[in-house]
Amino acid sequence: MKRRDFLKLSGAAIASSVLRPAESSAADAPKRPGRRIDPGLAVFMSDLHVWGGGRRTFGPYPINDYPREHLDVAVNGILAMDPLPATVFVPGDISWLYGDIEDYRYVKPVLGRLEEAGVRLVLGMGNHDRRETFFETWTQYAETTPVKGAVVTRVDAGPCDFIMLDSLHQPEKVIQLNQTGPYVAGVLDDAQQQWLEAEIAKIRKPTYLMAHHPASQLKVCGRNLADIIRTNPNLPGFIHGHDHFWRLSYFGTKWESVWVRGDGKYGFKSPADFKRQLCLPSVSNWGDIGYVTCRIDGEGLLFESVLNDFYGVHPVPKEKRPRHWDAIRAEHNGLKCHMFHRPWAEVPAC
C-alpha cells in the first residue's frame, strides 16, 4: 500500500476513540507450522510510540499514523526471519506519549503475533510509558517482576543473561498534566537500585543490562551505573533506546586508554576500553527507523541494524523528502557491533 493511501485510510480510523490494528496485518506474515526457533538469535526493537486512540497531542507533536505502519513493517520483518529469534526485547516507549491504555490495547495484539509464532516477548518501560496502564494490559509482568511495582525481567540466553531494567521516572504531578507532558530523564527507583546492587554482587555469568535510558543517566546506590559496568568483569555491555539512533559508545576513555602501559609499551590500560554501549533505533517515530538483530554465541553478541527508513520529526511526501535522509538510511543499515562476554582478557602490547 502506498503511503498516501495508508494515510487516507487511517484518517478515517482517527475518528474512532479506540483503534484496532489493521485486520490484514495478521495475514502479511503468517505463522509457518513447525518453524524453528533459534535460541542463539534475538531482536531488539525500541521506541514504538504508537497512538491507539488516547490523548491526541503534546506541544508541536501531532497525532500521526506512520508509527502504526512502521510497527507492522517491523513485526512482519521479524516474522519473515527463518529461523525465528527466540526473544524480542522492547526497552520502552511503547506508548505514543502518555502511557494511555488505548495505546497499549492497540499494540498488544500486534506484538502478540510474535508470541503466537513462539517468540518470547520482553517489554520494558520508557519515559512515555505508564506502569499502571501497562500492568493492566500485560498483567503477567506485575506477577513475574523481581522488583514489586517495576517492570524488570531477567532472561537466560544460554551463554549470557540479559536484565531489562525499568528507568521510567513517573512523578505524578508531571505525568497527569496534559499540558506539561511526561518526564524525560531516566531513573531507577530505590527498590530497584537495591535489588540490582544485590544481583550484581551475585553475578558470575556474563550479564548484559538494558534500559530505556543510557547507563550514564542511571544511579545504583550512589554510584553511576556506567562506572559500575566499566569496572565489573561480569557486565560486558549495555543496550538502551530513547535517542532513536543507532549509536555506539565506550565505557572506557578511548584516547587515554592507549597510552603507555606499566612496562613502557603502548597498549590498553583497562579492559573497560572494550566495553560498549549500543543505542537502538526507533521502530517508528523519528531518526533511524527499524530494529536490531543479535546473534548470541559463546564468545559474545553480534548486533546488526535493520533500517526501513530515516526521517526527521515526521515523514514527508517523496517529492519533498530531503536527499540526505536516504543517504543516512543507507549508511546506517546493516551496521554491526560486537560485544564480547569477556572483554577484560589481557590485551597484548602494540
Q: Positions of the model-derived regions?
A:
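A short C-terminal boundary segment appended to hydrolase-like catalytic domains
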Residues: 292-350
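Short, solvent-exposed loop/turn elements at domain surfaces
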Residues: 50-56, 171-174, 286-288, 312-314
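N-terminal export signals
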Residues: 5-26
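Active-site glycine-centered loops adjacent to acidic/histidine catalytic or metal-binding residues
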Residues: 47, 92-93, 126-127, 212, ...
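N-terminal active-site segment of His-dependent metallophosphoesterases
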Residues: 26-102, 198
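Short acidic, glycine-rich surface-loop motifs adjacent to enzyme active sites
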Residues: 200-217
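Extended active-site neighborhood of metal-dependent phosphoesterases/phosphodiesterases
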Residues: 30-34, 61, 100-197, 201, ...
